[in-house]
């Protein structure tokens, strides 16, 4: 939310009791009470408390408004708990290498739904380093836009073998 505000987005914060999950009905009420909400951001699993938000229920509330994007922080959930991105209609999911993927920080992972790809094409906020369209163009050529932490790719390869072995 702080980063979105720094880029000029109008942010409506929903605060929930520390150590308690977000209430999907309160999320739904906020969407009903405020017109023009373009996206809902939610943390799937909060690291410091271990609270897992009911992302499936929140998604159902958000996706009752099909034009609203669901943005998910999966930093501490990816690789640890189920996260069926497509069936839960998550539009953007962002995660890092440093928690459930068993390796040091330095890699990030992001998924975009078709709706999110369309939204980023029309986005007016400034971007340079985190330009997903540029990253996609490089990916199509088998490259990265900047120098990657190559050693982490080797670690990720091993970590994924371990995770796949666990089922």
For each of these PLM feature ranges, what is it?
Residues 1-36:
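PLP-dependent aminotransferase-like
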Residues 3, 26, 57, 61, ...:
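Alpha-helical scaffold segments in soluble metabolic enzymes
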Residues 5, 9, 32-36, 42, ...:
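Generic secondary-structure signature for well-ordered alpha-helical cores
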Residues 15, 41-45, 74-76, 96-97, ...:
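Short, structured patches in soluble enzyme cores that scaffold and shape functional sites
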Residues 20-24, 47-52, 78-82, 87, ...:
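Short, well-ordered, mixed-charge alpha-helical segments that flank or form enzyme active sites
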Residues 22-79, 92:
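Active-site phosphate-binding strand-loop segment of PLP-dependent enzymes
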Residues 86-98:
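Conserved active-site segment immediately N-terminal to the catalytic lysine
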Residues 98-167:
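Active-site C-terminal subdomain of aminotransferase-like
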């Amino acid at each position: 939310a702080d980063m979105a505000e720094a880029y000029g987005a109008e942010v409506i914060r929903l605060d929930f009791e520390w150590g308690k999950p977000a209430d999907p009905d309160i999320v739904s009420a906020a969407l009903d009470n405020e017109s023009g909400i373009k996206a809902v951001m939610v943390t799937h699993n909060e690291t410091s408390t271990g609270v897992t938000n009911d992302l499936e229920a929140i998604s159902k509330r958000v996706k009752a408004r099909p034009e609203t994007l669901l943005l998910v922080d999966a930093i501490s959930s990816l690789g640890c708990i189920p996260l069926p991105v497509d069936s839960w209609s998550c539009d953007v999911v962002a995660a890092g290498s440093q928690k459930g993927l068993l390796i040091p920080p330095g890699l990030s992972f992001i998924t975009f739904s078709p709706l999110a790809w369309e939204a980023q094409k029309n986005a007016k906020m400034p971007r340079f380093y985190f330009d997903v369209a540029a990253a996609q163009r490089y990916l199509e050529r088998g490259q990265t836009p900047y120098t990657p932490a190559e050693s982490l790719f080797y670690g990720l390869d091993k970590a994924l073998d371990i995770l796949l072995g666990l089922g």
